[in-house]
């Protein structure tokens, strides 16, 4: 399939969910995923989180005991500000209550520890793996294979239900590129990459609090390499993003649609900073100077 969104759409099509199923999502859930749930006739319901936006095992336990939804959908890493959810600790809680857990690892694969224990995951080749666009991934835990609503196909006799989830027309070059990206990660060592990216995130967050006119979003939240900053002096984030790009500093403009459950619709936006393992001090200096220069 061509993306994590396409993978999620496939899961929604084949998973044994009741009509109008209630899907528990944290407020930081990726906005397009929530939109997709609604388009499929499902009912996204907000899950409780702590002050940092974290869905803790204790909060999930209380919610599932008192008012369990039919499904949980959690982003391993929130795309708009890098919040890392403790999905590996959430999985046994969900399983104890018989509620399936899906995890979107699009921003987590090749970035943080992506071992989730989930019943299903969706991901993409690009982003932190630095693989090609146009390749998505879906994984389903073995106990669910025979419960998927996947009819047999004469064209593929003997193929299992998960194999039948694949697109008929494959982006073969993209899949090869994904293989190369995965091989590079394994050669380097996933643990070493995760540790370095955590260090990168700390370096960025340590460098930015003193930049006038900007503040770090959720500085106390668990995070990897992603940091988000928002203006405190009335700057236009879209204009700043463009100005920074002109100086060779790449940031991502994050508008409320990325996490409408957490970010008010009238919020002017924030800038996401997502450096990789090759970050050097000069990059941080350029970022800090560029942000400081935009202050009114």
Sequence positions of predicted segments:
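Conserved beta-loop-alpha segment that forms the PLP phosphate-binding cup at the N-terminus of a helix
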Residues: 1-23, 30-34
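PLP-dependent enzyme catalytic core of the Aspartate aminotransferase-like
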Residues: 246-247, 257-296
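Structural signature of PLP-dependent enzymes
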Residues: 162-206
């Amino acid at each position: 399939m061509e993306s994590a969104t396409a993978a999620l759409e496939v899961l929604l099509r084949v998973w044994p969910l009741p009509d109008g199923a209630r899907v528990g999502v944290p407020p930081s859930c990726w906005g397009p995923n929530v939109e997709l749930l609604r388009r499929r006739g499902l009912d996204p319901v907000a899950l409780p989180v702590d002050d940092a936006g974290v869905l803790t095992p204790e909060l999930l336990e209380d919610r599932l005991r008192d008012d369990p939804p039919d499904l949980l959908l959690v982003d391993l890493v929130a795309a708009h500000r890098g919040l890392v959810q403790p999905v590996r600790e959430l999985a046994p809680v969900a399983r104890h209550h018989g509620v399936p857990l899906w995890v979107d690892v699009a921003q987590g694969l090749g970035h943080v520890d992506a071992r989730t224990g989930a019943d299903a995951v969706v991901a993409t080749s690009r982003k932190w793996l630095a693989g090609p666009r146009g390749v998505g991934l879906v994984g389903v835990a073995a106990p669910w294979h025979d419960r998927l609503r996947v009819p047999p196909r004469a064209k593929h006799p003997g193929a299992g239900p998960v194999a039948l989830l694949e697109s008929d027309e494959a982006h073969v070059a993209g899949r090869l590129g994904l293989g190369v990206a995965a091989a590079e990660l394994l050669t380097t060592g996933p643990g070493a990459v995760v540790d370095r990216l955590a260090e990168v995130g700390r370096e960025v967050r340590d460098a930015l609090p003193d930049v006038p006119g900007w503040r770090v979003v959720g500085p106390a939240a668990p995070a990897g390499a992603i940091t988000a900053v928002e203006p405190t002096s009335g700057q236009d984030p879209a204009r700043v993003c463009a100005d920074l790009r002109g100086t060779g500093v790449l940031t991502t403009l994050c508008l409320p649609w990325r996490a409408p459950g957490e970010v008010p619709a009238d919020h002017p936006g924030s800038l996401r900073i997502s450096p990789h393992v090759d970050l050097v001090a000069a990059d941080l200096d350029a970022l800090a100077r560029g942000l400081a220069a935009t202050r009114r």
